[in-house]
Protein backbone atom coordinates (compact mmCIF):
# COMPACT_ATOMS: atom_id res chain seq x y z
CA UNK A 1 0.00 0.00 0.00
CA UNK A 2 1.26 3.46 -0.87
CA UNK A 3 2.12 5.93 1.88
CA UNK A 4 3.09 9.58 2.33
CA UNK A 5 6.26 10.95 3.93
CA UNK A 6 7.06 14.61 4.59
CA UNK A 7 10.25 16.59 5.29
CA UNK A 8 10.92 20.31 5.67
CA UNK A 9 13.80 22.72 5.21
CA UNK A 10 14.43 26.31 6.26
CA UNK A 11 16.43 29.05 4.53
CA UNK A 12 19.66 30.68 5.65
CA UNK A 13 17.52 33.59 6.86
CA UNK A 14 15.52 31.47 9.30
CA UNK A 15 16.41 32.65 12.83
CA UNK A 16 17.73 29.26 13.97
CA UNK A 17 19.89 29.04 10.85
CA UNK A 18 21.18 32.58 11.41
CA UNK A 19 22.35 31.34 14.82
CA UNK A 20 23.91 28.19 13.32
CA UNK A 21 25.81 30.18 10.70
CA UNK A 22 27.15 32.63 13.28
CA UNK A 23 28.34 29.76 15.50
CA UNK A 24 30.08 28.04 12.59
CA UNK A 25 31.60 31.28 11.28
CA UNK A 26 33.17 31.86 14.70
CA UNK A 27 34.40 28.25 14.76
CA UNK A 28 35.90 28.71 11.29
CA UNK A 29 37.72 31.86 12.34
CA UNK A 30 39.31 30.09 15.31
CA UNK A 31 40.34 27.14 13.12
CA UNK A 32 41.66 29.49 10.44
CA UNK A 33 44.14 30.88 12.96
CA UNK A 34 44.76 27.79 15.12
CA UNK A 35 43.87 24.34 13.80
CA UNK A 36 43.99 22.87 17.32
CA UNK A 37 41.30 25.22 18.63
CA UNK A 38 38.66 23.62 20.83
CA UNK A 39 35.36 25.43 20.37
CA UNK A 40 31.79 25.02 21.60
CA UNK A 41 29.95 28.14 20.49
CA UNK A 42 26.23 28.85 20.96
CA UNK A 43 24.30 31.80 19.52
CA UNK A 44 21.03 33.47 20.50
CA UNK A 45 19.48 36.08 18.22
CA UNK A 46 16.35 38.18 18.62
CA UNK A 47 15.10 41.64 17.67
CA UNK A 48 18.20 43.81 17.26
CA UNK A 49 20.39 41.53 19.38
CA UNK A 50 22.88 38.66 19.09
CA UNK A 51 24.37 36.92 22.13
CA UNK A 52 27.29 34.54 21.63
CA UNK A 53 28.38 32.21 24.43
CA UNK A 54 30.35 29.04 24.92
CA UNK A 55 33.75 27.58 25.65
CA UNK A 56 36.98 27.99 23.70
CA UNK A 57 40.57 26.84 24.12
CA UNK A 58 42.87 28.39 21.51
CA UNK A 59 46.49 29.33 22.19
CA UNK A 60 47.21 31.00 18.86
CA UNK A 61 43.99 32.74 17.83
CA UNK A 62 42.18 36.00 18.45
CA UNK A 63 38.74 36.35 16.88
CA UNK A 64 36.90 39.64 16.48
CA UNK A 65 33.47 38.33 17.45
CA UNK A 66 31.68 41.58 16.56
CA UNK A 67 32.88 41.78 12.97
CA UNK A 68 32.47 38.03 12.39
CA UNK A 69 28.84 38.15 13.54
CA UNK A 70 27.99 41.25 11.52
CA UNK A 71 29.56 39.83 8.36
CA UNK A 72 27.43 36.69 8.57
CA UNK A 73 24.21 38.63 9.14
CA UNK A 74 24.87 41.01 6.24
CA UNK A 75 25.81 38.15 3.90
CA UNK A 76 22.51 36.45 4.68
CA UNK A 77 20.69 39.63 3.68
CA UNK A 78 19.64 41.22 6.96
CA UNK A 79 21.04 44.64 6.11
CA UNK A 80 18.02 46.94 6.41
CA UNK A 81 16.61 48.62 9.50
CA UNK A 82 13.07 47.71 8.33
CA UNK A 83 13.83 44.07 9.15
CA UNK A 84 14.28 44.98 12.85
CA UNK A 85 17.41 42.85 12.73
CA UNK A 86 20.27 44.47 10.85
CA UNK A 87 23.90 43.36 10.71
CA UNK A 88 25.10 46.95 10.71
CA UNK A 89 23.28 48.07 13.84
CA UNK A 90 22.25 45.08 15.99
CA UNK A 91 23.79 44.65 19.42
CA UNK A 92 26.41 41.89 19.73
CA UNK A 93 27.26 40.51 23.18
CA UNK A 94 29.98 37.91 23.77
CA UNK A 95 30.07 35.60 26.78
CA UNK A 96 32.71 33.18 25.50
CA UNK A 97 35.04 31.73 28.14
CA UNK A 98 37.78 29.10 28.37
CA UNK A 99 37.05 25.41 27.87
CA UNK A 100 36.98 23.22 30.97
CA UNK A 101 40.35 21.65 31.80
CA UNK A 102 38.48 18.46 32.75
CA UNK A 103 37.11 18.09 29.22
CA UNK A 104 40.44 19.00 27.65
CA UNK A 105 42.20 16.33 29.71
CA UNK A 106 39.94 13.65 28.24
CA UNK A 107 40.46 14.75 24.65
CA UNK A 108 44.16 15.63 24.36
CA UNK A 109 46.69 12.77 24.37
CA UNK A 110 50.47 12.55 24.01
CA UNK A 111 49.91 10.30 21.00
CA UNK A 112 47.42 12.17 18.78
CA UNK A 113 45.92 8.91 17.49
CA UNK A 114 44.79 8.09 21.02
CA UNK A 115 42.67 11.26 21.19
CA UNK A 116 39.55 10.50 23.18
CA UNK A 117 36.01 11.35 22.16
CA UNK A 118 34.94 14.80 23.36
CA UNK A 119 31.76 13.41 24.90
CA UNK A 120 29.64 10.32 25.22
CA UNK A 121 26.67 9.76 22.92
CA UNK A 122 25.38 8.08 19.81
CA UNK A 123 25.51 9.42 16.27
CA UNK A 124 23.69 8.27 13.15
CA UNK A 125 24.36 8.28 9.42
CA UNK A 126 21.84 7.34 6.76
CA UNK A 127 21.71 6.83 3.00
CA UNK A 128 19.13 5.59 0.50
CA UNK A 129 18.60 5.52 -3.26
CA UNK A 130 15.92 8.22 -3.53
CA UNK A 131 18.33 10.68 -5.18
CA UNK A 132 21.74 10.78 -6.87
CA UNK A 133 23.11 12.16 -3.59
CA UNK A 134 21.71 9.13 -1.70
CA UNK A 135 19.36 11.35 0.29
CA UNK A 136 15.65 11.12 1.15
CA UNK A 137 13.71 12.84 -1.63
CA UNK A 138 11.36 15.02 0.50
CA UNK A 139 14.31 16.67 2.24
CA UNK A 140 16.38 17.00 -0.94
CA UNK A 141 13.53 18.81 -2.71
CA UNK A 142 12.87 21.03 0.31
CA UNK A 143 16.54 22.09 0.42
CA UNK A 144 16.72 22.64 -3.34
CA UNK A 145 13.59 24.78 -3.43
CA UNK A 146 14.96 27.17 -0.81
CA UNK A 147 18.42 27.28 -2.39
CA UNK A 148 16.84 28.39 -5.66
CA UNK A 149 14.59 30.86 -3.84
CA UNK A 150 17.69 32.33 -2.17
CA UNK A 151 19.45 32.54 -5.53
CA UNK A 152 16.49 34.45 -6.98
CA UNK A 153 16.54 36.85 -4.00
CA UNK A 154 20.28 37.52 -4.28
CA UNK A 155 21.07 37.18 -7.99
CA UNK A 156 17.79 37.57 -9.93
CA UNK A 157 16.11 40.11 -7.71
CA UNK A 158 13.86 41.51 -10.45
CA UNK A 159 12.02 38.18 -10.76
CA UNK A 160 10.63 38.33 -7.21
CA UNK A 161 11.73 41.76 -5.91
CA UNK A 162 9.75 41.56 -2.66
CA UNK A 163 11.64 38.59 -1.18
CA UNK A 164 13.17 38.81 2.31
CA UNK A 165 15.66 36.31 3.80
CA UNK A 166 13.42 34.10 5.99
CA UNK A 167 11.70 31.14 4.32
CA UNK A 168 10.55 27.56 4.84
CA UNK A 169 9.60 24.73 2.49
CA UNK A 170 8.03 21.32 2.94
CA UNK A 171 7.53 18.42 0.53
CA UNK A 172 5.21 15.45 0.94
CA UNK A 173 6.14 12.53 -1.32
CA UNK A 174 3.97 9.52 -2.12
CA UNK A 175 5.92 6.23 -1.96
CA UNK A 176 4.86 2.78 -3.17
CA UNK A 177 4.99 -0.37 -1.03
CA UNK A 178 8.60 -0.93 -2.11
CA UNK A 179 9.64 2.51 -0.78
CA UNK A 180 10.08 4.01 -4.25
CA UNK A 181 8.92 7.61 -4.83
CA UNK A 182 5.78 7.75 -6.99
CA UNK A 183 4.86 11.44 -7.11
CA UNK A 184 5.05 14.80 -5.39
CA UNK A 185 1.87 15.01 -3.30
CA UNK A 186 2.03 18.37 -1.47
CA UNK A 187 4.37 21.38 -1.49
CA UNK A 188 4.43 24.13 1.11
CA UNK A 189 6.46 27.31 0.54
CA UNK A 190 6.43 30.12 3.08
CA UNK A 191 8.60 33.09 2.22
CA UNK A 192 9.07 36.36 4.04
CA UNK A 193 8.33 39.38 1.87
CA UNK A 194 8.05 43.15 1.76
CA UNK A 195 4.66 44.80 2.00
CA UNK A 196 3.96 45.72 -1.61
CA UNK A 197 1.11 46.58 -3.92
CA UNK A 198 0.29 44.00 -6.58
CA UNK A 199 0.59 45.42 -10.13
CA UNK A 200 -3.14 44.92 -10.76
CA UNK A 201 -3.92 47.60 -8.14
CA UNK A 202 -1.66 50.23 -9.67
CA UNK A 203 1.65 51.91 -8.94
CA UNK A 204 1.34 53.31 -5.42
CA UNK A 205 2.66 52.88 -1.89
CA UNK A 206 1.24 50.16 0.35
CA UNK A 207 -0.41 52.54 2.84
CA UNK A 208 -2.03 54.49 0.03
CA UNK A 209 -3.40 51.28 -1.51
CA UNK A 210 -4.83 50.20 1.85
CA UNK A 211 -6.65 53.52 2.17
CA UNK A 212 -8.03 53.23 -1.35
CA UNK A 213 -8.88 49.52 -1.59
CA UNK A 214 -8.92 48.27 2.00
CA UNK A 215 -6.47 46.02 3.87
CA UNK A 216 -8.11 42.72 2.93
CA UNK A 217 -8.10 43.33 -0.82
CA UNK A 218 -4.53 44.67 -0.87
CA UNK A 219 -3.18 41.76 1.16
CA UNK A 220 -5.06 39.18 -0.94
CA UNK A 221 -3.68 40.64 -4.16
CA UNK A 222 -0.19 40.60 -2.62
CA UNK A 223 -0.60 36.95 -1.58
CA UNK A 224 -1.96 35.96 -4.99
CA UNK A 225 1.03 37.57 -6.70
CA UNK A 226 3.50 35.67 -4.49
CA UNK A 227 1.65 32.38 -5.08
CA UNK A 228 1.63 33.00 -8.85
CA UNK A 229 5.39 33.66 -8.81
CA UNK A 230 6.11 30.54 -6.77
CA UNK A 231 4.07 28.47 -9.22
CA UNK A 232 5.36 30.10 -12.42
CA UNK A 233 8.92 31.16 -11.52
CA UNK A 234 10.27 29.22 -8.54
CA UNK A 235 8.91 25.71 -9.09
CA UNK A 236 9.75 25.58 -12.83
CA UNK A 237 13.34 26.46 -11.90
CA UNK A 238 13.33 23.67 -9.30
CA UNK A 239 11.97 21.11 -11.78
CA UNK A 240 14.39 22.21 -14.52
CA UNK A 241 17.36 21.59 -12.22
CA UNK A 242 16.36 18.00 -11.43
CA UNK A 243 17.29 14.74 -13.18
CA UNK A 244 14.57 13.63 -15.60
CA UNK A 245 13.41 10.75 -13.38
CA UNK A 246 12.87 13.02 -10.37
CA UNK A 247 11.34 15.83 -12.45
CA UNK A 248 8.72 13.37 -13.74
CA UNK A 249 7.36 13.03 -10.18
CA UNK A 250 5.92 16.56 -10.45
CA UNK A 251 2.55 15.72 -11.93
CA UNK A 252 -0.17 18.32 -12.44
CA UNK A 253 -2.19 17.21 -9.44
CA UNK A 254 0.14 18.19 -6.60
CA UNK A 255 -1.23 20.42 -3.85
CA UNK A 256 0.54 23.77 -3.37
CA UNK A 257 0.31 25.96 -0.27
CA UNK A 258 2.09 29.34 -0.43
CA UNK A 259 2.24 31.51 2.70
CA UNK A 260 -0.84 29.75 4.14
CA UNK A 261 -1.36 32.44 6.81
CA UNK A 262 -1.81 34.96 3.98
CA UNK A 263 1.05 37.29 4.93
CA UNK A 264 4.67 36.86 6.05
CA UNK A 265 6.25 40.30 6.48
CA UNK A 266 7.53 39.96 10.05
CA UNK A 267 10.19 37.25 10.07
CA UNK A 268 13.78 36.39 10.85
CA UNK A 269 15.04 36.93 14.41
CA UNK A 270 12.49 39.74 14.82
CA UNK A 271 9.63 37.30 14.25
CA UNK A 272 11.08 34.35 16.20
CA UNK A 273 14.08 33.95 18.47
CA UNK A 274 16.92 31.98 16.88
CA UNK A 275 19.11 29.46 18.70
CA UNK A 276 22.02 27.29 17.61
CA UNK A 277 21.20 23.61 17.22
CA UNK A 278 17.43 23.81 16.90
CA UNK A 279 17.16 22.45 13.35
CA UNK A 280 18.94 19.10 13.70
CA UNK A 281 16.43 17.19 11.54
CA UNK A 282 16.70 19.76 8.74
CA UNK A 283 20.48 19.42 9.10
CA UNK A 284 20.41 15.65 8.58
CA UNK A 285 17.76 13.40 7.00
CA UNK A 286 14.41 15.12 7.38
CA UNK A 287 13.03 12.53 9.79
CA UNK A 288 14.30 9.47 7.90
CA UNK A 289 16.83 7.23 9.60
CA UNK A 290 17.50 8.44 13.13
CA UNK A 291 19.25 11.19 15.08
CA UNK A 292 21.36 10.93 18.21
CA UNK A 293 20.21 14.32 19.47
CA UNK A 294 23.49 16.24 19.32
CA UNK A 295 23.62 19.39 17.20
CA UNK A 296 26.57 20.16 14.91
CA UNK A 297 27.10 23.89 14.47
CA UNK A 298 29.63 25.70 16.63
CA UNK A 299 31.44 22.49 17.60
CA UNK A 300 35.05 21.71 16.66
CA UNK A 301 35.73 18.17 15.37
CA UNK A 302 36.89 16.81 18.72
CA UNK A 303 33.15 16.76 19.49
CA UNK A 304 32.00 13.41 18.10
CA UNK A 305 28.44 14.79 17.95
CA UNK A 306 29.69 16.35 14.75
CA UNK A 307 32.69 14.40 13.44
CA UNK A 308 31.27 10.92 14.11
CA UNK A 309 27.91 11.89 12.57
CA UNK A 310 29.81 12.89 9.42
CA UNK A 311 31.71 9.59 9.51
CA UNK A 312 28.48 7.62 9.93
CA UNK A 313 26.99 9.38 6.89
CA UNK A 314 30.14 8.59 4.89
CA UNK A 315 29.93 4.91 5.81
CA UNK A 316 26.21 4.65 5.02
CA UNK A 317 26.60 6.42 1.67
CA UNK A 318 29.56 4.29 0.58
CA UNK A 319 27.76 1.09 1.61
CA UNK A 320 24.69 1.98 -0.48
CA UNK A 321 26.77 3.17 -3.44
CA UNK A 322 28.77 -0.08 -3.34
CA UNK A 323 25.59 -2.15 -3.49
CA UNK A 324 25.76 -3.60 0.01
CA UNK A 325 22.14 -2.51 0.58
CA UNK A 326 19.48 -0.21 -0.85
CA UNK A 327 19.06 1.67 2.42
CA UNK A 328 21.46 1.89 5.36
CA UNK A 329 21.40 3.37 8.85
CA UNK A 330 24.68 3.41 10.80
CA UNK A 331 24.92 4.12 14.53
CA UNK A 332 28.22 4.90 16.24
CA UNK A 333 28.50 5.35 20.01
CA UNK A 334 31.36 6.76 22.10
CA UNK A 335 32.44 7.29 25.70
CA UNK A 336 34.13 10.56 26.69
CA UNK A 337 37.91 10.25 26.72
CA UNK A 338 37.86 6.86 24.93
CA UNK A 339 39.16 6.68 21.36
CA UNK A 340 37.41 3.65 19.88
CA UNK A 341 33.61 3.58 19.58
CA UNK A 342 31.87 1.48 22.21
CA UNK A 343 29.48 0.13 19.57
CA UNK A 344 28.77 0.05 15.84
CA UNK A 345 25.24 -0.78 14.66
CA UNK A 346 23.89 -1.18 11.12
CA UNK A 347 20.29 -1.44 9.94
CA UNK A 348 19.61 -2.18 6.26
CA UNK A 349 15.82 -2.42 6.64
CA UNK A 350 15.85 -5.84 4.97
CA UNK A 351 17.52 -4.54 1.79
CA UNK A 352 21.00 -6.10 2.19
CA UNK A 353 22.50 -7.88 -0.82
CA UNK A 354 23.54 -11.54 -1.01
CA UNK A 355 21.84 -12.53 2.23
CA UNK A 356 24.14 -10.38 4.35
CA UNK A 357 23.03 -9.85 7.93
CA UNK A 358 23.14 -6.44 9.56
CA UNK A 359 25.45 -7.79 12.27
CA UNK A 360 27.91 -9.08 9.67
CA UNK A 361 27.86 -5.71 7.89
CA UNK A 362 28.53 -3.90 11.18
CA UNK A 363 31.48 -6.19 11.85
CA UNK A 364 32.92 -5.42 8.41
CA UNK A 365 32.40 -1.69 8.97
CA UNK A 366 34.56 -1.94 12.08
CA UNK A 367 37.28 -3.60 10.01
CA UNK A 368 37.15 -1.27 6.98
CA UNK A 369 36.84 2.13 8.69
CA UNK A 370 39.04 3.55 11.45
CA UNK A 371 36.52 5.27 13.69
CA UNK A 372 38.85 6.81 16.26
CA UNK A 373 38.20 10.59 16.44
CA UNK A 374 41.76 11.46 15.36
CA UNK A 375 41.43 9.29 12.26
CA UNK A 376 38.02 10.71 11.37
CA UNK A 377 39.44 14.23 11.70
CA UNK A 378 42.43 13.31 9.53
CA UNK A 379 40.31 11.55 6.89
CA UNK A 380 37.98 14.50 6.32
CA UNK A 381 40.50 17.31 7.09
CA UNK A 382 38.23 18.59 9.84
CA UNK A 383 40.77 20.89 11.54
CA UNK A 384 40.15 23.50 8.88
CA UNK A 385 37.68 26.39 8.40
CA UNK A 386 35.13 24.41 6.37
CA UNK A 387 32.02 24.65 8.52
CA UNK A 388 30.01 27.78 7.75
CA UNK A 389 28.69 26.35 4.42
CA UNK A 390 27.32 23.34 6.32
CA UNK A 391 25.14 25.54 8.53
CA UNK A 392 22.37 26.03 5.96
CA UNK A 393 20.70 23.60 3.53
CA UNK A 394 22.03 20.48 5.21
CA UNK A 395 25.27 19.10 6.58
CA UNK A 396 24.80 15.98 4.43
CA UNK A 397 23.69 15.33 0.88
CA UNK A 398 25.84 18.18 -0.43
CA UNK A 399 28.22 18.11 -3.37
CA UNK A 400 31.86 17.93 -2.17
CA UNK A 401 34.25 20.54 -3.54
CA UNK A 402 37.69 22.02 -2.96
CA UNK A 403 38.54 25.69 -2.47
CA UNK A 404 41.67 27.69 -1.73
CA UNK A 405 41.38 29.40 1.67
CA UNK A 406 43.84 31.65 3.50
CA UNK A 407 44.78 30.19 6.88
CA UNK A 408 47.44 30.89 9.49
CA UNK A 409 49.80 27.99 10.15
CA UNK A 410 52.99 28.20 12.21
CA UNK A 411 52.47 31.94 12.55
CA UNK A 412 52.34 32.58 8.80
CA UNK A 413 49.42 33.21 6.47
CA UNK A 414 49.33 30.61 3.72
CA UNK A 415 46.83 29.60 1.06
CA UNK A 416 45.59 26.08 1.55
CA UNK A 417 43.32 24.05 -0.73
CA UNK A 418 40.60 22.65 1.53
CA UNK A 419 38.12 19.85 1.00
CA UNK A 420 34.55 20.82 1.81
CA UNK A 421 31.94 18.13 2.54
CA UNK A 422 34.58 15.41 2.30
CA UNK A 423 32.23 13.00 4.09
CA UNK A 424 30.12 13.00 0.90
CA UNK A 425 32.90 11.47 -1.22
CA UNK A 426 32.51 7.91 -2.52
CA UNK A 427 36.21 7.06 -2.41
CA UNK A 428 35.72 3.99 -0.22
CA UNK A 429 33.37 2.22 -2.64
CA UNK A 430 36.14 0.06 -4.21
CA UNK A 431 37.36 -0.99 -0.76
CA UNK A 432 33.82 -1.79 0.38
CA UNK A 433 33.09 -3.84 -2.75
CA UNK A 434 36.30 -5.81 -2.30
CA UNK A 435 35.61 -6.48 1.36
CA UNK A 436 32.06 -7.68 0.70
CA UNK A 437 32.94 -9.56 -2.51
CA UNK A 438 30.63 -7.45 -4.65
Please state what every model-predicted region is.
Residues 278-280, 285-329, 340-347:
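C-terminal catalytic subdomain
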Residues 40-59, 336-340:
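Short, charge-patterned binding micro-sites
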Residues 1-40, 429-432:
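N-terminal, positively charged regions that mediate nucleic acid binding
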Residues 12-31, 130-150, 299-323:
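Alpha-helical support elements that line or immediately flank enzyme active sites
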Residues 8-10, 14-19, 115-131, 265-290, ...:
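Conserved phosphate/anionic-ligand binding catalytic regions in large, soluble enzymes, centered on
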Residues 6, 67, 74-265, 397, ...:
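Glycine-rich, mobile lid/loop segments that gate access to catalytic sites or pores
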Residues 37-41, 167-173, 254-258, 324-335:
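A short glycine-rich, hydrophobically flanked beta-strand micro-motif that places a catalytic Asp/Glu
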Residues 46, 325-327, 334-438:
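Internal helix-turn-beta structural module
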